[in-house]
Amino acid sequence: MRNITLLLATVLLLGLLPAKAQDVRTSPIPTGYPFMEPLPRHFAVTVEGQEMALYNDSTFWGGTIDFGSFEMKDGKDVTISVRLDEDIHSLELLPKPKDCKVRQIDKRQIEITTRKADWQQTLVVNGCPRKGHVLHLFCNRYAEGTQPTGYRYDEPSKTHLFGPGYYDLKQLTGAATLTVSGNQKIYLAPGAVVNGKLSIRDGNGAKIYGNGMVCNNQTSMVTVDNSIHCAVEDITVHGHALHAWQVIIGSSRNVRMKGMKIFNPHYASVDGIDIVNSSHCTIDSCFIRANDDAIAIKGLGNHKPSEGVAVTDLRFSHLQLWNDCNNAFGIGAETHCREYSNIRFTDSDILFSYDDPIHHNNLNERAAMNICSLHGTFFHDLLFENIDVYHCQRLIGLGFRQDFWFGQLEGDQTGE
């Protein structure tokens, strides 16, 4: 009887919404979410009149970052209203809008219209990307079907299901990491926020997906290790830990990452995606903002490069990259692998790339697009094509190095 009552209440509520409002869905910040920063809230956003929740963080330079997402049905006309708490003196759109139209309505309001789902748009207001007010908006495709409530493991589909709400993994399961293997899955529904780490280990067809978010202030957020034919799609990753790579693909093949939104603006060693000793992977339509490498392709180990695996057949496309430190797209610096080959970085936007907030202009081994080889190996069949760069300290860097980070990492160019 209770389920019937809830269903009727939902139907009645939908009946009260305007037709266009039923084509979108927003989710509130769940009760218990622990990482809201005590910062000025410069933005208020509504989507077809529905309030959109904004999460926040800060830049190294004291600027503010707000970000949020909503869902819409593809092909439907949708209007997003962005209101500022102060007059707009400057407005920069990153990248140039492709899937939406943006116009300033008055001195404190911006209107965005679209009929296409699955896009990402950044607004920089009243300042530069380092110190201004930055808003990252993410438009996701509407998740159809009945969404889960609470947490449960669905045995027939081998899926961990998280409905809307806040979940502390350690309190929920006794461990801060949820690991799946084989062809198991983890689904984060819209409005689900999981505090912990999600991991695929020894996977074959495993998947982490959904429009929810994973966050923590301790370690990496998503890892794929020793796996084949696995995928991570659509989730938001918001890191608060220092010296922890956000997303790692390690010793794996045929891994696909698509539609992810990845954040950690805290200095440093907080790479967005690290691909380590892995091949035949695809990274598509992701937004990555990190206070270190946005993307790094590495060969790690104590072996000679000639004894390592080949890092080959990697595809990166339709990305938006923002690095407050190091590189937007980098190969290295650790290059303990037999070769790097058949790597494609195409049709993407580098929104902002800066060398280092503390050691500005003192490090010459970093750039928006960079190859920094500490260990002698071979590079061939690499393609950088159709890349729009909006802000960068240095566009391209290529070099074989004897050491890295003030001598803390020693290089060896013998190749043995």
Predicted regions span which residues?
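Extracellular/periplasmic carbohydrate-active domains that bind, remodel
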Residues: 22-416
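Bacterial Sec-dependent N-terminal signal peptides
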Residues: 1-22, 209
